[in-house]
Amino acid sequence: MDKNIANAMLLRLNKQDQIEALKSIGFTTVNENTPASDIAKYMQWSGTLLDLSLATLRIEDGEQVFFTASEWNSMSANNRSKYIRIGIRLRAECHQFIIAKSACVDAGGNKTFKWGGYGTDLRGLKNYGSGNQGLYDTFDGKENTDVIIETLAGVKDTQGTVGAPAAEVARAYKACTLESDGIEDTTVWNLPALGELMLMAKYKTEINELITSMFGSQNIFTNDWYWSSTEYDASSSWYVNFSGG
C-alpha cells in the first residue's frame, strides 16, 4: 500500500483505533495517555516522514531511551553519563529499528565477512530472485538471522566457509560491555533484511550526519556494499551497494 494512503487511513481512525494501528507497526509505547500531538507525529512517521534519534541504554536499569540530537546536546555532562550511546534509531515508512553505532569487527580488526552456506538452500528463508514481488518489503532481519545461524552452525559449505560468519558476528555485536561501560548490551542485533538495508541506503546522508555528530565520522556508512540476510537462491544472497543501491 502507498505510504501516503496508509497515513490518510490512520488519520480517519478514532484515537483508540489509531493507538492500536500504531502499535501494530512498531510504536509499542503509545497508549491512551499519549498526547494527541505525539500521536499526530507518530502517524506522520508511519507515512513518509523520517525520524532519526540517538539510541541509548540507561545504566541504572538497562532500558532503551531515545533522544533527539538537540535533546542530547542540551543535557549536562552529568546527565549524559547516566546513558550509554548504542546507535541510531530510524523510524520511517511504517518501520523502525536501531542501527548499531559502529561496524562489526573481529579480533584482528577485519570488517569483511563471508555469508556462508554456499550451495545450501536454507529451509525457513524464502528465496527472492530478481523481480520477486515483495523483495523490497522484507523487514525480517531478526527472523532471518535466527534461521541462518541455527541452520549453518558448524556446517562447512562447498567453498570451505564454516558456519555463517556475517550473521554470527552481527548477532555477537556488543555496543557496550559491563567491564568497559558498566552495563552489558543485551540488544539482539541482526544481519538486516534487504528492505531494512534499502531504507538505510535511502536515508544514508541523514543517518551519516547524525552518526558523525554523535559518534564521529569514522563510523559513517561508506560507499561500499553490505550483506543482507535475504536469500536469492542456494548459492547467492542479496547485498546493497551504498554508493548507488
Report the location of each language-model feature.
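C-terminal, surface-exposed recognition/capping segments
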Residues: 2-7, 14-17, 173, 194-245
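Structural recognition of the beta-strand scaffold that forms the well-ordered cores
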Residues: 97-100, 190-192, 226-228
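Enriched - but not universal
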Residues: 48, 75, 118, 192, ...
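Extracellular low-complexity Ser/Thr/Asn/Gly-rich intrinsically disordered segments
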Residues: 130, 162, 166, 190, ...
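Short, compositionally biased
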Residues: 1-185
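Catalytic and binding regions of secreted/periplasmic enzymes and modules that target cell-wall glycans
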Residues: 188-189, 197
